[in-house]
Amino acid sequence: MSSESLFSKISPQSPGQEELVKVLADKKYEVVGLFGPTGSGKSLFSVIYGLDSVITGRYRRFIVTRPIIDVVTGRELTSADLGELYYKIVQSYIEDLVSGFVEWSRVQELVSKGQVVIADTHYLKGRTFDDSVILLDDAQSLPVESAIEVITRLGKNSRLIIAGDPVFQRSIGSRDSASMLRELLLGEENARIVDLGLKDIVRPGARRGIKLLLESKMRSRQLDETEKLVLSSLRVHAPDADVVTVVNLVDLKKTYSITSEHTPDALVVAKEGYQGRVVGRGGERVQSIERDTEMKIRVVELTLDFKPFIRAVHPVSWVYKHVVDVDFAGPNIAVKIESNAYGPFVGQKGVHVRFLDHFFRRILDTGVRCYEVEVEEGRSAKRSRAERK
């Protein structure tokens, strides 16, 4: 089987996946870090690349290491705990990934020849991997020290791929290994980071699962007294509405001296399809809640698009029109903003973006980073005319 025929079977479906493929194909990067949510293609592309590398002879071995976690206790299980079952579990994971791309009998042949090797990170001392591709998957579930141990095992003509989820596969308030490894690799020579986001999740099932994870994070928030007050009023005036959470913004507005009338006192996050039931046919429900609580309320639906959240709470009412993209990049939400609106978006001394950062940390335990992007002159002029109207 040729390299081209195997790797061509998996086509990138998003700009992030296209960048991933380019980075994997560029041998100048000895260490490649792939960070993003479940379903974005990290493991699939990495495993196909590794298999392709040994089949074509570019590398002698493909080493796969992946922690196995007991979902009940949260404890990592080693090959000493599980014996032969440890290797069978990892092989099953590889089999599920490559189904439809390469015959499993071909992979088993590579395993029997020692060209595909499953390794336990706990038992790597004294080993050196020459002429090998090493995949360290699910890095968020490993101690950073274990991941660094893998890096020290890199020998001549070898590459390391580290894949992890720094957002959805960590507990609230924790500092996971994937985030720390990403920071460590950012400044390393011959290392390259590829951040994958929600737009890189192409399977409908995976997108649904990520949305449920987001919803679970929001629903598990501990509400303060103000948020409980709003929720109680919601249950009276909108009993048929499915509300995910309520976010108090009063204290944040005081902290960052936000005086804009556009920013509400509280944000209600409704499950997708239920925003209308919170607001009411003519807005009468949300108006009743505002009278009850003496607060300004705004409502958004929970989808995989965070732009409506920025539109709902940012102090500058029109700035959302200049938001080019909002998605996860590593452990943070990255907001790309047109250069002509970058100043108002950030605010004086960064007060607006610090307000947004605090808001998203409160609702999702995730920070915000903003990036200025240039836009075509024609598009910018068209935008300005539209705003004047």
Predicted regions and their residues:
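Short, Lys/Arg-enriched, disordered terminal segments
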Residues: 1-6, 385-389
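Hydrophobic residues in beta-strands of the RecA-like P-loop NTPase core, especially within AAA+ ATPase
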Residues: 135-137
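C-terminal structural cap/anchor segments
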Residues: 110-112
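Conserved helicase motor core of SF1/SF2 NTP-dependent helicases
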Residues: 2-11, 17-21, 26-74, 79-104, ...
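Extended basic-aromatic, gly/pro-enriched interface segments that bind polyanionic ligands
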Residues: 107
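RNA-contacting regions in translation and RNA-metabolism proteins
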Residues: 200, 205-389
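Short amphipathic alpha-helical interaction segments
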Residues: 139-142, 348
